[in-house]
Amino acid sequence: MKQLYILFLVVLFAHKGSAQVTNLITAKVINAKGIPLEFANVKVIETNQYATTDKNGLFKISGLQSNTNINIEISYIGFQTSRIPVTIKTGENNLGNISLKILDLSLEGIEINAKRNYSGATNSSLIITRELIEQTPALSINDLLNQIPNRKIQPPSLQKVQNLNLRAAYAPTTTGKGDFELSNAFGIAIIMDGNNITNNANMQSYNPGRSLGQGNSFVESGSYGIRGTGDTKNAYTGDFTFGGTDLRQIPADNIESIEVIAGIAPAKYGDLTDGAVIIERQAGKSPTYVRMQLRDNATSYGFSKGFELSPKFGAVNFGINYVNSFQDNRDKLKAYKRVNTNAMWSNTFGKYKQLKNTFSVDYGRNLDGIKHDPDDEKSTRTRFDSWNFSVSNRSNYRFNSGFLKNVSLNLRYAEGHQVSYTEQLVNEPYILYTTATTTGVHEGTYDTGVYTAKSLIDGRPINSAVNLDFTGGFKTGNIAHYISFGTGFSYSANNGLGQTIDPNEPRSGTKVATTTIGATSSERFYDFRLAVAQKDLGLYIEDVFTANVLGKPLNVRAGIRSDIQNGYASISPRTNINYEVSKNLRFGLAYGLGYKSPGLAQRFPGPTFYEIPLLNAYNGKVNESTYLVYVERYEPTNVGLKPSKSESIELSAQLKIDKFNLSLTAFNKKSTRGISTVQNLQSIVLPTYTATLVPGAKPVVNQTGVRPYAINYFTFKNDLSSDNQGFEVILNSPEIKEIKTSFNVSGGLFKTSYGSTSNTLSSKVPNTIPTDPNYAFIGVYEPRNSKAYFSNGRLTSITHIPKLSLVVQFIAEFDLLNKTISTESSRIPIGYYNSVNEYIAITNFDKANPSYGHLYITPEEQKENDLPRVIANYHFSIAKEIKKRFKFAFNVYNAFNHQPYYITASGTYQYPNSSPTFGAELSIKL
């Protein structure tokens, strides 16, 4: 990091005193009353050059090439952002006065829907502007992402982890912890103010090497909720290890814009496979905003203010947000509380204000958990608490001449503390346990079976990153090239206490059952500080230019990226090309590769312990009893764990007819080397014992022979793959002036063929052990191979009456298709393990065979999902502004309480629509 900072300073001073400025662009930024706007932000999109207006509203940008076309974006908090195309002429280019309009409901033509019109960094970028954000009462950024086409609208709630999936359809899970859901979410980068909010250092889980793998390794609650209502909840977890960043932690109040890249990201962005969400927050001088949102299940309060320190010391923008929400207001057992505060100091330096610097400090705290339910006989308590702190600095230096146009240095350090805790009462005659941590036969311990089982996972993730980026420009003939190149380094570690598990008081599921003496995977203490810090390095170069082909502009963004992740090097070519046939028709083509580094929890999951009881000679007196147990310690290395990979190709088009705007995108994305846990079944031969009880002394133990036992554990491998195809469509209509109403139609269709490379195992142990020595206990099936289809569409009407400062929005949403298909062969075993753990292959499966016929899986058991009909849902919102200072908004999800249901093939009831939820928001601008 030190070397990159020195390089930044060297480049900066090396260009001081260079050739005189030849081309200059200048303008004055004012409001509707002609008053100059100080601290307005100005950005040249192509060269990444920044400027800030002075007290007279003036800005100047030099070093632009003659006869080139650029776009200047001018923004000011509380005003509508303006984007102006400019053709640079030799000498001074004075744009005169640029008037920004105050952003309120009296403004004509405000954006209420996200747009996809080639204005972002990629062909398929979906832009969510501040205009839309202000009209969307949101508890978190997840509510704003409901604008993504072919995504089912989620009601405003903070009662479960919010992970984002892009361009994929998988068999739905109730927890969102399916292997493919986690892999897709983990591959989506959340970029805030130029920094990747990574989840690489998150290690909050039990040992994933235990039974059932990563998706079942989270701290979970018991059942909770009001009994007898049919809506009892179960197995909640607030952890989001192995997946993406929990979007609940990101408030929406101070966000200026969001760019959702579901396709091929620019080469600048690394450590991703499935897209990126680029968030820019408000910085600079602004009015005072006070917001209060009251919902049926939550209350939210927000305050923000940007004020000028002085013309010399710049401006500071400060914000704070508090949310208190419940799963059910009637019992308030399940609660989520969040407080976020941030401060951003912005200033420009130098005689010509060429250096712009933004320094940010953020702090957030989350209290998530379930209190003791009086109806729970186990007195279960669960909590998932955390705090996070980050400090970052973004510097941009604008050059007035020469090849280099801009250099930027981004630094960030983030640290947090995560606590996942659960406790429950255990009431049994006695328990068996061992604290041994080495492989071999050990004498275990008898202890009381009445205690409180406690599990605490303590994590302290640390993430730091440095990014150095350059933008340059040159011409080849009549073509202006804008070259961006740079490097980035990221560091992730976890200094938490780790899995502070006490084997003396094992929780349910990890203790040896005293009645059956069955084998189990047990738990031990694991210190997260033993995990070696993750260090990833990336380099990139990219060229952006426009060429004339047949007299029409061909816009090209082409680059290449190289990363070193977990010791593996990768090359990622990426390109976004679009051809402007006319002002009303444009076609696009994009192609690229992406790689996502494995996280610390996948690289260093910790040792797995498997216990096989060999003898339990117990007569009710500990001093006269003996417990022998075999402990197997497995140390996963995961040295060969490679970064996951995706390869995408995308076609896009935009058509404008009579003010109708149609955007269409089709894609094919192939994801390979997805990381998941794979079940390993091994056989080991161990001694058998008998014991003769001796009054007043330990039993006499004799070895009588040997027998095979099964050892079962999970390891991380690059096991997942998926092939995704689909299309997305967005259609915007012009406003019908007579009724002041416009319409928006969006939707799509996704198909995903997904599977794994490893065989799957299924336990079929009967209640009564048969005498047949070849009876199948564990079935072996071919690797997972399924297809899923998903289609969602919506029709939105927006009535905007500027004279009344009123907006009314109605959404009709339709679930068109939601289907999962598994191959017939996946239900037929290819082999099995018998009682002595001997593998027997099956060549011609016979369902009538008494030894293995019970291994056949029926379609009902596979729980294939198939939406039998179109399911509709309806949402409504209204917003009214008074004197441009007070705004009242009201919104309802599932406005008509439409609760259709259907019965699945397995006989379970499915309710696709959530219960109605409503809320009101009051905002004040001073």
PLM features: what roles do these ranges have?
Residues 323-443, 455-461, 913-919:
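Flexible loop and strand-edge segments within Gram-negative outer membrane beta-barrel domains
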Residues 439-553, 773-783, 809, 824-828, ...:
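Outer-membrane beta-barrel transmembrane domain signature of Gram-negative proteins
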Residues 549, 668-670, 689-826:
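Gram-negative outer-membrane beta-barrel transporters
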Residues 142-230:
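Extracytoplasmic beta-strand/coil segments of soluble accessory domains associated
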Residues 96-99, 141-144, 162-165, 191, ...:
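N-terminal periplasmic accessory domains that precede
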Residues 28-33, 40-43, 73-79, 89-134:
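Short, acidic, small-residue-rich periplasmic hinge/interaction motif at the N-terminus
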Residues 670-673, 677, 814-836, 848-856, ...:
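C-terminal beta-signal and adjacent terminal beta-strands/loops
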